[in-house]
Amino acid sequence: MKMAITALVLAAVVITGAVVTPARAQSGYETEPVLNAKDLAVADLLKGPHFTVNPKVPVKGFIERFTIQSSYGTFKANGLRMLPIRVNEVEALAKLDDLSKTKEFAEAAGKAIARPVTSTVNMLAHPVDTITGFPDGVGRLFDRIKLGGERVYQAATAPGASGGERASEASKRVGMATINAMGFEKERRDLAKSLGVDPYTTNEVLSEKLTDAAWVAFSGRFLIQTTTSILVPYSMAMSAATITNSTVYDTPPGDLINNATMIFGSTGATDAQVQALVQNPQYSLTTLTELAMGIQRLQGVPGRDAVVIFAAAARTQDECRFVAGAINMLARYHEAVAPIAQVSAPGPILGRTAGGALVVPMPVDYVAWLERLGVAANRPDLQAPEKVAFISGRMTPRAQKEFTKRGWKISESFTTAAER
């Protein structure tokens, strides 16, 4: 399964001569291009029975932004890693649609009690990814981030808040269902697992459909997994949840939050700093768990508290996924290449080996030579006898040249799938 996922994603990043060359800005820097989808992903991820991916893919903030037109709506896949996830979700929607039309499901729906009128799926009323002022992909995270005076979330530092109150606030995040009937939440997780999708998906349409179907199964005593075979063609791609080794499927959400809180606290971060991260609603529970597991893989490495503080400042779901991906890339380097002796996160996340090498993980798709990179490459705190950047995607020839000229070694296609 893992090999299939890796092969699919790696095949999707093969670059041909047809890829658009980024324009050269008058300042000497490049501008981010619009690429051709057919040059980025295999055909099966671009068109299927229920979806078509737009042929043009703009790059913004180092992230390739795919648009998926489907029978169930238009969906955005920000990043090559997200494309198979969103495509799989469309196929899952088709299966749920087919399921809802069966005689058995109709009978179960007739037996089911009414869903609580207050039940819903927590989706941000105005997703920060689209708010004017944050249209930047993950580019902001390569700048120095001013964290000292920034109050990320007031609730995180509210005096007198009990543990229960803070846990309640932590559950108010993107992708969380709010039906509290005993046993329902597990039914929903099991359904998501059978479909090969993230139970805490940020796809609002799928999340609501999962809740609807799981409620019928739970309340109407309809055995979905035994009565109906749900096999999704793109389940080989699975979801972001695969990075957590099925933890998000098998563990109640309250336990996931408590486990993440404990791991973040073990870094030496203060309670207020930990709560600022845990209560950041832009982190889906899956991404928060992925981040916690990455930090745990670096257990004992000084400086992990800086990652907690940095992670809490994420403003968008793109930035949250970047932080989680970066720390897991760094953990893989620590485990497989050379031990990391120190972690810091001035913007971006950095690792230093005992030999003094500087390691920068970059879970991004496409790196053009932008002005912010020119500034970052010359920063005093980003200098070392040996400097290595690992990129899950690739750089333009110009960016490669400029980084190499400044003493950097670049490793491309260091895929996030390989973190596992």
Label each region the model flagged.
Residues 26-155:
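Cationic, glycine-rich low-complexity segments
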